[in-house]
Amino acid sequence: MIYVDNRQEKMEVSDEFTNHLEKVIEFALKEEGVNISSEISLLFVDNEEIREINNETRNIDRATDVLSFPMLDYPEKKVFKEVYTENDFSEADFDGDDLVLGDVVLSLERALEQSKEYNHSYEREASYLVVHSVLHLLGYDHMEEEDKVKMRKREEEILTALDIRR
């Protein structure tokens, strides 16, 4: 289950755009071995709101493109498909029948800015940011170079499989 909450008014959000991002999320989850009914919240915000959230949660007072709030714990350098192969979850990890993976907060305003900066489509940038964030929900990180390489490789593999190119 993907819950979409549009909390901004600067960018138009069509059903087609929302459906596309939901399909991207579902595909990324499947590719990462999430074979259980799950829940992700996808929030669309503007630069001001993501700046406020970034400041409140990370003590960084600036806008960013996407924030991820994973609900599951992972051992260092391990991801979902390496840790939860037996679907060994506690009851607290669920909302009804759905495993709660976490929240994705996406600044659509920043996604548009970056699409222009990187000279590719807005849809491609939003798709990339959603894949990036979903991978964070599944335990990926990019603080160390080795982890960054692993994460970037998975991002590109997923986007390429979806035929979403620069």
From Swiss-Prot:
Binding site for Zn(2+): 132, 136, 142
Cellular compartments annotated: Cytoplasm
Coiled coil start-end: none
GO cellular component: cytoplasm
A biological process term (GO) from this entry: rRNA processing
Keywords: Cytoplasm, Endonuclease, Hydrolase, Metal-binding, Nuclease, Ribosome biogenesis, rRNA processing, Zinc
GO molecular function terms noted in the UniProt entry: metalloendopeptidase activity; RNA endonuclease activity; zinc ion binding
Predominant location category: cytoplasm
EC number: 3.1.-.-
HAMAP family found in the cross-reference section: Endoribonucl_YbeY
NCBIfam families named in the record: rRNA maturation RNase YbeY
Record protein name field: Endoribonuclease YbeY
